[in-house]
């Protein structure tokens, strides 16, 4: 039986590297993996991981592929000796983090070029053959940042929102050609991704006003805490295998349930008010409480202990969602049933 030919982008580290080695070392020996990197000088960790995991000879080949360059994509495609790719994994990605006005436009363009146009270049190269053969799987490394807006991730979220629309649109069409598209929705993962943020965290911060810089510094402390609780890449790679092996793969697979209540809020209140208020609460309520305490002020409608903050949800927001977020209906005088408390 012919092996399943898998081509993966962005394999110098993180999810791409772990997935390539996981498939190439699989005991079934049913995968032939083409692990691609933008620069072959960065292949050292991948080679070491393959050696450590005992990848059999011929199970893993490393190719140079820069998703920003159509000629590079075509050259890598020509190196696939089987003449086909059964599973295409679009994993290469780039991040940008900090106040929007602090970013250089070339850094913004680089993120969009890799995350959006890079994925499109790969699809344009490999989809035609999959459609001709009436067989193929496309897996795209996505992010909760493509399902909900996150402060100080505006450009990154824009790129990931674009991937959601791209893949969802293709998922409607491609089953007619025997091809399936799946998004692997990741939260924070322990990879080098966060060390490679374009321009570093915040970029040229002096371009932002003092209040925005203050808010960013506060947000960054919570962000660092979130990264300390990130998943290991090995956990996430198993989701890719699930999507590969499913007879009828889903459009989305989630590596964590942590953000699902917030994501559901966006669909259950199409106005967006519930989600915006909830994320504001999540990101900045501690700061507001601290500043109120420093000023000797009391948050209106909240007890002197200031141990909880109030957020008002529109009537269309389902109470179950609030409950999943750890909120309870407020019984305080003057508050209606659309108000909930969350301990902070």
From Swiss-Prot:
EC id: 1.1.1.51, 1.1.1.62
Reactions that this protein is recorded to catalyse: 17beta-estradiol + NAD(+) = estrone + NADH + H(+); 17beta-estradiol + NADP(+) = estrone + NADPH + H(+); testosterone + NADP(+) = androst-4-ene-3,17-dione + NADPH + H(+)
Enzyme class: oxidoreductase
Subcellular location: Cytoplasm
Modified residues (Phosphoserine): 135
GO cellular component: cytosol
Protein name (database record): 17-beta-hydroxysteroid dehydrogenase type 1
Species this chain originates from: Mus musculus
